[in-house]
């Protein structure tokens, strides 16, 4: 999992492909084997579990993607301005405080989009 998805870490290549950079906070996720020992991520994009509330997992990146999608649509963090229309329900689910209530995989988020 990346654990630091934010606009500064998303680049677009010359051929139009989206690339994630800066993997300093990332780790390989193995269910029930990993234990977070440090707070990592960027304020505003980090999921609540990154502040020690729970262990991070792939849903942590889904939270950050929800924030990123909202910023792309509104220019604002979802805590300030939530996008309207069809994307509102998607973003609200992606940035849910409870990881169990978020999309459970990037595939699930992609299908909703």
Question: What feature does the model see in each segment?
Answer:
Residues 102:
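Conserved HRD-motif arginine in the catalytic loop of eukaryotic-like protein kinases
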Residues 36-49:
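Conserved activation segment of eukaryotic-like protein kinases, specifically the C-terminal portion
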Residues 83-97:
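Conserved C-terminal C-lobe helix
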Residues 65-74:
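Short, conserved alpha-helix in the C-lobe of eukaryotic-like protein kinase catalytic domains
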Residues 1-12:
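Catalytic-loop of the protein kinase fold
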Residues 53-57:
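Activation segment
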Residues 61:
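Conserved catalytic-loop aspartate of Hanks-type protein kinases
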